[in-house]
Amino acid sequence: MKLSKFKFNLPSELIALHPAKNRDESRLMVVHRDTGEIEHREFKDILDYYGKGDVFIFNNTKVFPARLYGNKEKTGARIEVFLLRELNEDLRLWDVLVDPARKIRIGNKLYFGEDDSMVAEVIDNTTSRGRTLRFLYDGNHDEFKKALYALGETPLPKYIEREVEPEDEDRYQNIFAAEEGAVVAPAAGLHFSRELMKRLEIKDCQFAFLTLHSGLGNFREIDVEDLTKHKMDSEQMVVNADVVDIVNKGKDEGHKVCAVGTSVMRAIETAVSTDGHLKEFEGWTNKFIFPPYDFSVATSMVTNFHMPLSTLLMMTASFGGYELIMDAYDIALKEKYRFGAYGDAMLIL
């Protein structure tokens, strides 16, 4: 499969800059793989497609305020630091991306906060934009994290071209988020409100929560036409025994199994055994799913409308079928569905 097969023209006005007023009131396009039928619904109508014993698998990773702005020592030049992950708690070492990269070198000190209350030293270059920073902070680890996060802001995707607003802290986070570590929100889950979750529970649907810490690799441009040559960034994930039991029981009893988002789909396809059952997994995945691909666990999927040429669109097309999904995207453009993390949703049955 070639990269260019996933190109389409997305007008900028269809990229959602803000979420729907209520989480579960975004639009929902329902795509039926067996008949090719496409329905236009509201997200809360997802209730109509699931019942007793059906399983929803969610990603409970939690986004942290990863984007910091600071100044370089001596010159005072403004810099952006994007926190990726903590490497060493005791030494306050973090893996980060910096911008402008060419001006940030080993040995430089970076200052954050109005009174330069937080200082970091560049101790290593990891990639062209990647650096290892050591934060110089005297308090304990909890105090350090609190101070660091107070300086950070919600890491909205770059395609949301506006300033971060107070509501983003809440809305760019799933209501069931629990395990901190993501710099990208699993967007399919953003449509699930507390009320909708309650109503699914009343219908006796089952919930399973795995963890995959979504990273910036989701937005990295693919620079090869032949998709077999693309390498995904690795992401940390955990599928525990509870998830395995709930999913395999539902599957064995013939119930629907819904993967809520591409991150969930990547995780369960990483943790699947040869007989199509889920198994426990703790580690890293760099699984890249593109057409054609045979899925083993999920029978349905919720996902957002993705950017052209993105790996997320490729996975969606793998599950829904390339022709059907690209046709559905044509319809979405004509019907002015909203794209991106704050946009509308698609349910593939």
Curated annotation (Swiss-Prot):
One of its GO terms (molecular function) is S-adenosylmethionine:tRNA ribosyltransferase-isomerase activity. GO terms for biological process: queuosine biosynthetic process; tRNA wobble guanine modification. One of its GO terms (cellular component) is cytoplasm. It is an enzyme of class 2 (transferase). Belongs to the QueA family. Transfers and isomerizes the ribose moiety from AdoMet to the 7-aminomethyl group of 7-deazaguanine (preQ1-tRNA) to give epoxyqueuosine (oQ-tRNA). NCBIfam families: PRK00147.1, queA. Monomer. This is S-adenosylmethionine:tRNA ribosyltransferase-isomerase.
